Amino acid sequence: MKDSVLDEVRHRGSAVIRDVLPRQSALDLKKQAQGYIAANPGVKAFPPDDPTVYELYWSPSQTAARAHPNMLLTQRFLASLWHSSDSRSEMSTTYPLTYADRLRIRRPGDGKFALGPHTDGGSLERWEDPEYAKVYQRILDGEWEEYDPMDARHRINARMDLYDSPGGCSAFRLFQGWLSMSSTGPGEGTLQLCPLLKHATAYLILRPFFDSTSGSLNLDSSFPGSVPGAGQEYNPETHPHLELESSMVSVPHVEPGDFVAWHCDTIHSVDKQHMGRGDASVLYIPACAMTPPNVEFIKQQRMAALAYSPPQDFPGAGGPGEVGFHGAVDWGKVPGDGLRAMGLGSSGWEKSPNMSEGEVSVIEKANRVLFPSVSA
């Protein structure tokens, strides 16, 4: 791929990757998911009166998509767009880890599943947590042009959920993303993004320190759109200069098997109304680097997987979840590399001579934590 294309992805903070899975394979995954839901009436979903997002994490469809070789390659590619300004940073982009999330089947006409412009990864934490704040230090120093959104150095150990928020994420996700299982275009219940990553982030970080009307310095305790225990929200009143009415851009038309990814700081929203004729269905699959905190997260998530229980970031964590469900995934049939990315299986990760000091260190730690019998 040309460097100019890679630079554009880094600049915009988002990408559509075509044909990650064959079209028919993606459609088969949707059909399988629908069958799994129908076979298990106890599945929880919201909104409860017209389900759109299903509280499923270990269905055969989700597990197969996460473990697919093309999906692992896609995550590795997305991770490779990142770097650390410190070679000692304990992060591996060679071996991304798998974060289990939910699935969405949004029906035509739906207007209930509407998420306004927001950014995940906490809100006040960006200023409050000392390590997280260092991510944006160049912006706070008045040198926003020098800020590098793809530098993971201070994100690795940042605390992005200081308030145990119900929608918080305990893992460091380089990119959020989903795999399309539908033919869906703009206005058809899909995603909108603000493709001005560096500019929008600089505005967000500096916004609490000036009056939006006069532009004068404002050092009171207000942080517009930031509420403890919630993600960062945006609207024309709190962040008027973002001009959200025009700066939020719909994701291009996608087909089953296409993958959409957006940077962890990207402002995103969902169409208020699904104006299409077919369902807008996706499997949420982010790209996560191997870092010490993420390894510890995977260790806990692995326990949830084997118990068919919701992972620690989601409602009902530790509860019965999908225990006893008809058609539950058989872990013995999941490919080895896919299992390993979930901290399962029996083989650890290999080191290579060209890896940085930090990458070697985190791989050794991951093997000790997740595969102690192999690393011993």
Predicted regions, residues:
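Fe(II)/2-oxoglutarate
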Residues: 1-11, 332, 344-345, 349-376
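Non-heme Fe(II) oxygenase catalytic core, chiefly the N-lobe of the double-stranded beta-helix
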Residues: 4, 9-12, 24-238, 245-252, ...
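Hydrophobic beta-strand signal
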Residues: 16, 261-262, 284
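Short, charged beta-turn/beta-strand-edge "cap" motif at the junction between a beta-strand
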Residues: 262-268
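A short hydrophobic beta-strand segment most commonly corresponding to one strand
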Residues: 277-292
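Double-stranded beta-helix
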Residues: 288-317
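Long, charged, low-complexity terminal extensions
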Residues: 311-346, 352, 375-376
